[in-house]
Amino acid sequence: MPVKSTARKKLSRATRRDLDTRIEFMEGIVRRDPDYVDALQLLGDDYTQRGRFPEGLQVDERLASLEPKNSLVFYNLACSYSLTRQFDRAVAALEKALRLGYRDFAWLAKDPDLKKLRAQPAYRSLKEKIQRLKKKAG
């Protein structure tokens, strides 16, 4: 499963180089096996860390088609939509993630990838749903 990461961290030159090398490697794997979910997850995370949000979004959309019942895939898709300023789509993906069982409310509240989304009016109604789910979870 991918790690929680954010593209907001300033990356050192060595880290950028390592990420670029890993991206190139993972792109090769995905070219050979376009349905390799684990490779796609790593590639999407690396694109996001590197600030390559449109490419990360393409990967997350691909993952959503391959893993339609995976709550974390839809959470990451919401992050990609938020990072590309597609806020209505981000809300829809986040709603689906919650319907599928995503429950890491603490991370959702502070994830920097969703910062701009949380400032949007569309997020308000979703915030109410999140509060109800938190109460239910106990």
Q: Model-predicted segments: where are they?
A:
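Long, contiguous interaction/recruitment modules in multidomain scaffold/adaptor proteins
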Residues: 1-28, 138
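TPR/TPR-like alpha-solenoid helical repeat scaffolds
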Residues: 10-19, 103-129
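Alpha-helical adaptor scaffolds
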Residues: 11-15, 27-85
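Accessory recognition modules or surfaces
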Residues: 39, 71-72, 114-125, 133-138
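Boundary/linker segments of alpha-helical solenoid repeat arrays
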Residues: 71-72, 100-110, 137-138
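TPR/TPR-like (Sel1-like) alpha-helical repeat modules
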Residues: 88-105, 128-135
